[in-house]
From Swiss-Prot:
GO biological process, one term: urea catabolic process
Protein name: Urease subunit gamma
Keyword Hydrolase: yes
Organism placement in taxonomy: Bacteria, Pseudomonadati, Pseudomonadota, Alphaproteobacteria, Acetobacterales
Pathway(s) per entry: Nitrogen metabolism; urea degradation; CO(2) and NH(3) from urea (urease route): step 1/1
Family listed: Belongs to the urease gamma subunit family.
Pfam hit, one: Urease_gamma
Recorded catalytic activity of this chain's protein: urea + 2 H2O + H(+) = hydrogencarbonate + 2 NH4(+)
Length: 100
């Protein structure tokens, strides 16, 4: 199987998001990379499902709460920017202050 660098990045994010979901299920608080991966995966999959940029920008802030991440992580993540593929092309989605 031959994957482009972009496809490899998407696969890595999806796998990291899956690990993050399993940790949340066990009650383990997420670290910075896990939180970023989970929010990024939410945006990528939402775009694939046909949701709008505005919806994803809004709802990306509901993926995680402060209680689900390690201390200091919310303060480290001011914005998450994701290039996602929508039915009408690739767009940049920015989720501001994603962990509330």
């Amino acid at each position: 199987m031959h994957l482009t660098p972009r496809e490899k990045d998407k696969l890595l994010i999806a796998m990291a998001a899956q690990v993050a979901r399993r940790r949340l299920e066990r009650g383990v608080k997420l670290n910075h990379p896990e939180a970023i991966a989970l929010i990024t995966d939410f945006v990528v999959e939402g775009a694939r499902d046909g949701r709008s940029v505005a919806e994803l920008m809004r709802d990306g802030g509901t993926v995680l709460t402060r209680e689900q991440v390690m201390e200091g992580v919310p303060e480290m993540i001011h914005d998450v920017q994701v290039e996602a593929t929508f039915p009408d092309g690739t767009k940049l989605v920015t989720v501001h202050n994603p962990i509330r």
